[in-house]
Amino acid sequence: MFIKRFFNLVFAAVLFTWVPPAFTQTLEEVVVTAQIREQSLQDVPISVSAIAGEDIADRSVDNLQSLSASVPNFMVVETQIDTSISIRGVRSGANKGFEQSVPMNFDGVVYPRSQLARTPLVDLERVEVLRGPQPTLFGKNAIGGAVSITSAKPTEEFEGKFSTSHESDHGEDQSLLVLSGALSDNLLGRLTVSTREMDGWITNTNMKRIEPQRDETYIRGQLAWTAGDVDFNLKVETADFDSVGYAMEALAPQDGYSLVFAGPIAVETNEDWVRSSGETFSQNTMDNFVLTANYPMDGGGTLTSITGHVEYDSYEVLDVDYVGLEILDGTNQTEKYDQWSQEIRYTSPGGEDVDYIVGAYFQTADVDVTDYVPLGSFLALAGPPVSLLVGTNWDRLYAQSSDMYSVFGQADINLQGNWRLTLGARYSNEDKDGSRKLTLDGTGTALAGSPLLNVLWAGVLNVGPHDVASSRSENSFDPMVRLSYDLSDNSQMYVSYTEGSKAGGFDIRGNSIPGTPLVSSAGGWEFEEENATNIEWGYKMKSDRASFDFTYFTTEYDDLQTSVFDGVLGFKVGNASAAELDGFEMQGRYLLTDNLEFYASMASLDYKFTDWKTVSAHTVRLPQMVFIVTDLVPALFLLLKIQRMLDLHTILFYQITGCLMLI
């Protein structure tokens, strides 16, 4: 283990149109919907960061990966085979069979697949990052936290905006068009069109081009109207977000790497923004709609219906050996996903002795994933019998259907004095049917029709043909208890206990199953539910010119879902015995002058796996305990920002970020 330190200094000046008519001597209030209701951020007893849509636009943040750089204990990383969302180090591994530990909730609809984390962020009202398990209101599987995204809504007054920008270093161009206003006396509309193109910044010497290249188009249309007492909002969106190449290099060769890849087959491993890799690209198409209806009930409460449909297709060509040599070039991967969901909930009017939310949720989804992996000519250098594998390939087909329903509720009970008790729970039932089939093909090679094909794939690459299908059903109950105390009108303390769960499922990427002939280490098929227990203590305060919040947390995970490299070509999916994490988050704002604001955030995290069931070659064993520090976890995060309003059209901000990473 070693410590890698890096420190970044960022200076930026951004020009934009400033909407508020004048400066104010009080700190602007941040409104969030972390508990469904609109509340001031400082009144919500949850560790949450909220980023306004205007702030996202002003900083040219175009996706969650860019946004995560300024949010404590939140990290989004796009890799060649997956996109990972991590809160407090909790994330799903690079296996499409895992449910997302940190689901996206976009306008009330769950976007549960990792590929959807690449959705462009444009024309938004706000983005909220909720840390810690959030099962009650954001659904089963939100075991690490949740990301809530709210799009800007249609307006009664006409609004029009067009912006375009160019960045010369990376050859990036972005354009945004927004039109909003009344279409008739009872119908409002909003249209958002965004495009982005980028040339990249890493030289791929093998492909003779700059990477990663981006080409994104996003269109969103909304209609809002009232029929009787019911308010409706219909959102339809479509997007194409494509990329060529990836922002990654081969670094830090270990063991005998430099001896094997030497001479004419040398692989460049310097940290110099240069890589050597085969063809890689990703093509993604998304089509969604959401219909939201709010019906005011007698007594002041609101009955809400949210009907959603999410559909996307993904096609990718990968070079999974990550080097310019023809080993596993031309790997094809496709994914098709289709989801329908329906939520109905009742929200009490608020401000009473007991404020509550109750509801029910139903979701049905289908996913189909294919993999095609050919073996390249580089293996010919190994000589027979390994060289006989050149030109052979495998096809892997996976299909899954699932149905889930849940009921949930949360109540805030105002006790005597300044005490407040919050009780919440969600009960869920989910059924899944899955199948996976892997076949080997030696057509056009010396192994066509020969039993030696299976022998060599198993002996050299630990891959074996198989055909498996099964069903599973599981129930979960996730409770939450929170006690809050108002120290004054402007400050509070709270402590909470939450249990969360993430559904089990089937291994999409397995290369074999138990009982597969000839393989040296059989892969898995089914994995079980993951569970978490989280305890938090927090403090929040606000005044006219300052706000501050602090959260300390400790979380224990049981049956943690993991994906461990098998030492050859694949990954073995299973459940680790336990993991533990603890740390803190704090963030604050202070209005230094009428036009000068200071912002600071800091986070610390200690995350370790314990009592590991499935051990890889790099695991260090200690007496009665196994410790592994997870990746994508900053041990220490620090962000300092000073923002100054120079005039009505110019804003200047200085930003310093720093992280201490344990690897």
Predicted features, each with a name:
Residues A224-T226, Y346-P349, Y361, Y398-E556, ...:
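Structural signature of Gram-negative outer-membrane beta-barrels, strongest in the C-terminal barrel
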Residues T24, S180, T334-T347, G351-G359, ...:
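Conserved C-terminal beta-signal and adjacent last beta-strands/turns
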Residues F158, N186-G189, D229-F232, G300-L303, ...:
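Repeated loop/turn-to-beta-strand initiation elements of outer-membrane beta-barrel proteins
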Residues Y356, G417-L421, S547-Y557, G574-H649:
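Gram-negative outer-membrane beta-barrel transporters
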Residues N288, T292-P296, T302-L318, D486, ...:
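Membrane-embedded beta-barrel scaffold of Gram-negative outer-membrane proteins
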Residues S148, E156-F158, S165, L177-G278, ...:
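Periplasmic-side early beta-strands and strand-to-turn transitions of outer-membrane beta-barrels
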Residues I85, Q100-S101, R113, V122-R131, ...:
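Outer-membrane beta-barrel translocator/receptor signature
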Residues L27-E157, W537:
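Acidic, small-polar-rich N-terminal luminal/periplasmic segments of exported/outer-membrane proteins
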